[in-house]
Amino acid sequence: MNEKYNVYLVSDSTGETLDRIFLSLKSQFANFDYEKKEYAFVRTEQQIDKIIKECSKLQNSIILYTIVETKLAKYISKQSEKNKVPCFGILGNLILSFSKLLNQKAIHKPSAQHVLDDDYYKRIEAIQFTMSHDDGKKTEDINQADIILLGVSRTSKTPTSIYLANRGYKTLNIPLVLDHKIPQILKENFSKFCVIGLVADPERLSEIRRTRASVNQSIDLKAYTDVEAIKVEVENSKKMFKQYGWPTIDVTRRSVEETAASIIKIFEIKKNK
C-alpha cells in the first residue's frame, strides 16, 4: 500500500501558477496518493509559522512554494528545515538565474504578473470575442478572428477556443454539420486566414456524442451517434481540409492544452511567413 502525502501549496499570490506546476508534476507519478492544501497570499512570517506548525504535526508533509520576496522565501526554507519538513521553492533558482542572465535585479514583487497591462486587456477582448463567436455564430466577423477552428460535432472546438482566448487569441469556431455551411469568404481566401481543422476517431466521437445525447433529449440519438455516419462526416471534413490546404489536428488523444499549443505554433509560423 502506498503512503499518503500531505502536499502544501504555499504562494504569495493567487496560487494559480503553483497549482498548474503541481498538476504537471503529479502527472509524472502513477502511484502518488496525496491530499492537497492550498494557501494563497502568504506574505508574513506569522502565516508561514502557522503552516509549518500544521505540517509538522502530520506525517509525510511536503511544502511547495512560490514566494518571490527573498527574505520570506529564506524564512519558509529555514523553518521547514528546522522542523524537518521537505520544502521546495519553485521560482527561486529560476529568478536568480534570469537575474544573472539579464544582468538586472529582479523586483521580487508578488502578483507582478497580474498587473493590468496591455496583455491583460488583450485577453479580455479575446475572451469576449470568442464567447460571442462560438459554434458558428457571427461568421460575418471572420476578418477579426486570429484563429478559425473547423470540425464536426464534439471535436473540442469550444473548449479549445476558450483556452486560446485566455491566451489572447480571438478564436471563432464553426461546426461542420449539414445545415451549417462554412462562409464563402473562407473558400475564396483559404490561404489568408489561420484556419485549422480538428478531427477525431469516429468511435471515440460516438461515445462522446452518446453522453451528450443522454443530456439533450432533443438530439436524434441514432443519426448523431452512428459510427458509420460519423466516419463519413470525419472523412468529408478531412477531404475539405486537404482541398484548401488547412492544417489538421487529431484531438483524439490530446488534451485541450496540447491541441492549443499546436494551434499556437501553427499561428506563429503563418504570422511570420
Regions found by a protein language model. Give the residues of each.
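N-terminal accessory targeting/assembly segments
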Residues: 1-21, 25
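Short beta->alpha junction loops
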Residues: 36-46, 176-178, 253
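Metallocofactor- and cofactor-centric catalytic cores in central/energy metabolism, strongly enriched
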Residues: 38-57, 63-67
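Ser/Thr/Gly-rich flexible loops in soluble cytosolic domains mediating phosphotransfer, phosphorylation
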Residues: 81-125, 226-232, 239
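Internal active-site segments that recognize and position negatively charged phosphoryl groups
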Residues: 124-170
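Small-molecule kinase domains that catalyze NTP-dependent phosphoryl transfer to phosphate-bearing small molecules
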Residues: 130-137, 211, 218-259
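Short beta-strand-centered segment that lines the nucleotide-binding/catalytic pocket of NTP-utilizing
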Residues: 171-182
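Conserved phosphate-donor/acceptor-positioning beta-strand/loop module used by diverse small-molecule
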Residues: 191-210
